[in-house]
Amino acid sequence: MSTNNSVLVLKVGGALLQCEMGMARLMDTAAAMIANGQQVLMVHGGGCLVDEQLAANGMETVKLEGLRVTPPEQMPIIAGALAGTSNKILQGAATKAGIVSVGMSLADGNTVSAKIKDERLGLVGEVSPKDATYLKFILSQGWMPICSSIAMMDDGQMLNVNADQAATVLAKLVGGKLVLLSDVSGVLDGKGQLIPSLTGQQIAELVKQGVIEKGMKVKVEAALEVAQWMGQAVQVASWRDASQLVALAKGEAVGTQIQP
């Protein structure tokens, strides 16, 4: 068994759900790590599925600075696409790889506190760590939590939370190592080349230049926040090469390291 007690928090984007081979490779890698004693927590988005479901219902997708605007009438569809379909697709892939998983959302187990992030965004939530008991129990059994980014306020109102921010908060809660996985190999410079390491100052400069924008801006800023909070680098890497995860579990650098 591995002596690595740190939880590996893997955030996966919606694009993964549309790539069966990518999902299978990622889950096989996660299964091997869990068998070796590594605790793994997966957090997911599902933007592609949400867009499809909204379009099927004649509703428009609007984004503000890389974040999805969530009007009240869209909330049931978004919750269904994320906490329902997306979550179960990933759970199915985990089961196929021999992983015992628990499908959950941010609303479960008193795990986080949630509030409205910005009135302009509608029912978009901002969450903060609350109670790790539920997650720690699941992880202690050798099971893998697969968490969607649907949260709930104290009055029962569902909120849509950006999945990168959700992963950041859960990494804080369990004191884990955060890896933000997308369909790109990391943060790319203006010429499309991978940047191996970035500091907060360099990120601010690249945002100013428009090199880092939209979804990647949200991702990198979430990574920087948790890197600073935990005093350790956060990785932004690709799920397309799941073998990178094994290197990461061994403490090797992959993708772009966001420095605290």
Curated annotation (Swiss-Prot):
Pathway: Amino-acid biosynthesis; L-arginine biosynthesis; N(2)-acetyl-L-ornithine from L-glutamate: step 2/4
InterPro entries found in the cross-reference section: AceGlu_kinase-like_sf, AcgluKinase_fam, ArgB, Asp/Glu/Uridylate_kinase
Presence of the UniProt keyword Calcium in the record: no
Name recorded for this polypeptide: Acetylglutamate kinase
Gene it is expressed from: argB
Enzyme Commission number, as recorded: 2.7.2.8
Any one annotated GO CC term: cytoplasm
UniProt cross-references to PANTHER family, sorted A to Z: N-ACETYLGLUTAMATE SYNTHASE, N-ACETYLGLUTAMATE SYNTHASE, MITOCHONDRIAL
Residues reported to bind substrate: G46, G47, R68, N160
Organism name: Shewanella sp. (strain MR-7)
UniProt similarity note: Belongs to the acetylglutamate kinase family. ArgB subfamily.
Annotated site location: Transition state stabilizer: K11, K219
Compartments, record wording: Cytoplasm
Function statement: Catalyzes the ATP-dependent phosphorylation of N-acetyl-L-glutamate.
